[in-house]
Structures are given as C-alpha cells and as structure tokens.
Amino acid sequence: MEAKDIRELLAQKKMSMRDIVTVGRYTAGHFRNDKKAELYEFSHSDDSYISFNALHVFTFFDAYDLEWLQEKHDDLINCALSETANNKLRLQLTLLLRQPFYPELIRTDFIDFCLSKFTNPALPYAIRALCMKLACKQMTAIPELTDELESNVQLLDQEQLSPSLLSAKRQVETKIENARKKQAAKLKKKTQRS
C-alpha cells in the first residue's frame, strides 16, 4: 500500500471500519513511524474529509502506537487552538486527553482555551466535557490552578447540564478533591521536615 492509496481511503465522506483498520495496520508498530508521520500530515490537509478521517484513524490507535503522537503534542494543541470545525476539534481534544501532561510543560494558552470552552453553553457537550477533563488534567498539579479550576467548574451549577456533561463534572470534582488531599499531604510532610 502506498500513500496515494491511503489518501484515497481518507478522502471518503465516511470511512468504513474496514478502511480504518486497513489504515491502522499500515501505520501500526514502531517500525512504521514514517507511515504515522504520513498519516499525521494528512491530518493537516485542506480537504476536510482527509484531515478529519486521518484524525479519526488516530483515535483507534492503541496506547503503544499513540506514544508516537506525543512528539506532536504542541502541534496538536496549536491545531486545537485554531480549529473552527467542531468535529475535528473533538478528535484533536480526544487525542490530547489520551496524552500525558507534565506540570513543567503546561501551556497557559491551552488552559485558558479549555476553561473558556467548557464554560461556554453554546458549544457541543462533547467538546465541553473534553475541555473540562483536559483543564483538570493540567491544573490539578498546582494548588493555585486547582482553585481556579474549581471556581470555573462551580459556574456550571448555574445551568441545566446534559447527562454526559454532568458525568464529566462529577469526575472532575472527584479529581479536584483527590488533588487537594495530595496537596495537603505534601504540605504537611513539608512542614514536618522544617
């Protein structure tokens, strides 16, 4: 299979599961990182079907193959920050949620983006839930940011939430509570040493 064959599969209006598996096999394994790079380039295509389908294929990757995508972490964030199509944004956020976030590499522009999106009632529920979870993933490592996250999550109490958004909110509230316990234990340990 060649890149032009993959392009033809990705150019379909709706890819079948069989085609997704075909492209996945074409790119699977550490010895096919060049093929993953090709697929990633397709995610930047001007053709909306090709770019959407390339991102869609990445969402089916297993944890091993997704490791390769971590080197594209900042690029994925940049793409999400500028994305105007909700369907592509949802896939980009899904891929970012499956990646680790390290406190020393946190991007405040992406935190602000996530906060503004999950509190915006005009956006689709999936995007709001993903942004809430991504904000949590980035902000609970730092006490001051945990406070800000909690304040923003509390803003959601003023609106009627869908079941999916309510579930995401509860999950985030649990993670905030757990983060506070860890932060308190860390502070207690630090004061005992002094």
Regions found by a protein language model. Name each.
Residues 1-194:
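Alpha-helical scaffold domains
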